[in-house]
Curated annotation (Swiss-Prot):
<dbReference type="GO" id="GO:0022627">
    <property type="term" value="C:cytosolic small ribosomal subunit"/>
</dbReference>
<dbReference type="GO" id="GO:0003735">
    <property type="term" value="F:structural constituent of ribosome"/>
</dbReference>
<dbReference type="Pfam" id="PF01090">
    <property type="entry name" value="Ribosomal_S19e"/>
</dbReference>
<dbReference type="InterPro" id="IPR036390">
    <property type="entry name" value="WH_DNA-bd_sf"/>
</dbReference>
<keyword id="KW-0687">Ribonucleoprotein</keyword>
<protein>
    <recommendedName>
        <fullName>Small ribosomal subunit protein eS19</fullName>
    </recommendedName>
</protein>
<comment type="similarity">
    <text>Belongs to the eukaryotic ribosomal protein eS19 family.</text>
</comment>
<dbReference type="GO" id="GO:0003723">
    <property type="term" value="F:RNA binding"/>
</dbReference>
<dbReference type="InterPro" id="IPR001266">
    <property type="entry name" value="Ribosomal_eS19"/>
</dbReference>
<comment type="function">
    <text>May be involved in maturation of the 30S ribosomal subunit.</text>
</comment>
<dbReference type="InterPro" id="IPR027548">
    <property type="entry name" value="Ribosomal_eS19_archaeal"/>
</dbReference>
<keyword id="KW-0689">Ribosomal protein</keyword>
<comment type="subunit">
    <text>Part of the 30S ribosomal subunit.</text>
</comment>
<dbReference type="GO" id="GO:0000028">
    <property type="term" value="P:ribosomal small subunit assembly"/>
</dbReference>
<dbReference type="InterPro" id="IPR036388">
    <property type="entry name" value="WH-like_DNA-bd_sf"/>
</dbReference>
<dbReference type="GO" id="GO:0006412">
    <property type="term" value="P:translation"/>
</dbReference>
Length: 150
């Protein structure tokens, strides 16, 4: 059995984001073209499909950590604020984006609420497990060193 931990994160996130986009279970909001992803950012994201990439990355973080709340997830996507000549300070990412994506992922059936925060549902686990299995198969065709994971 291939775990998400053994698959390169960039390949997994891109694969899952394409899958989420093709399924059309997550609605891309109108404001996603104009919004910054946190107070520490100066510009909006360059990638037009950033909302699906963020959703896939959130699913991966939930898989690895078990459960996360909105505040802790926003600190995962935070950064440091450039305050000119003064010292940098830590800042959280946008909680409204995370809240929106949690609601959309709950509607799609990939995330469920728990008393400790949000966690992956069995459907979300299956999505990530199948994606990691497909990626390892693709990597094994190119490099025989990945055969041991199949």
């Amino acid at each position: 059995m291939v775990s998400v931990k053994y698959v390169p994160s960039d390949l997994l996130i891109n694969y899952v984001s394409e899958k989420l986009k093709s399924e059309k279970k997550i609605a891309e909001p109108d404001w996603s073209k104009y919004v910054k992803t946190g107070i520490s950012r100066e510009k909006s994201p360059v990638n037009r499909d950033w909302i699906y990439v963020r959703a896939a990355a959130m699913l991966r973080k939930l898989y690895i950590n078990g459960y996360l709340g909105i505040s802790r997830m926003s600190s995962e996507y935070g950064g440091k604020v450039d305050r000119g000549s003064k010292r940098y300070h830590a800042a959280q990412g946008s909680r409204s984006i995370i809240r929106y994506l949690f609601h959309e992922l709950e509607k799609a059936g990939y995330v469920q609420k728990t008393p400790k925060g949000r966690s992956l549902s069995p459907q979300g686990m299956s999505l990530l497990d199948n994606a990691s299995k497909d990626i390892i198969k693709q990597l094994a065709e190119k490099d025989p060193a990945f055969q041991k994971f199949i």
